[in-house]
Amino acid sequence: MAVIKAVDEYADLMRVSATSAGNDHRLGGNEAPPAIVSIFLGDELTAVLESIENDTFFGKQKKVQLDIGAHVLPHFVKDTTDRNRTSPFAFTGNKFEFRMLGSAASVANPNVVLNTAVAEALSQFYTELEGTKPEDMEQAVHELIKRAIRKHKKVIFNGNGYTDEWVAEAEKRGLY
């Protein structure tokens, strides 16, 4: 949740950390993510967050078999994480990828911005939980996460970032 909070609150700095004349021209093109900073979590992780937010049980997602049209090959299960290459910030199974940066650019600036923003989010979480009695900690953490999801879920987008509909939706969400 700290990463989602950090990206939401510091999206402008994340964007600036990847800025160059060539990269600004590239962003939003067919081979690059759009310039609107959003996070792709995938269906499964998004469903987990929705379950937490709504205090509902999360049942493991059903595995979907890919139909590749060849019956002599083994069956493949669809990956529940990132297949969306239109997202500038994507969860890819066990990590987040920041994809706005050009291939020849240094990752130093984006790393400093992201690490500092996540550290700030974690510090704010700590401050909020500081002094909570041990027997109340689990409930306090649960409520903190629910509030954070509600406040920062606007930055989560699992769709196609190249569409005009996304630009309009991002504008409604205050991301653009």
For each predicted feature, which ranges?
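Hydrophobic, small-residue-rich alpha-helical packing segments that form membrane-like cores
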Residues: M1-D8
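Acidic, glycine-enriched catalytic cores built around paired aspartates
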Residues: E9-Y176
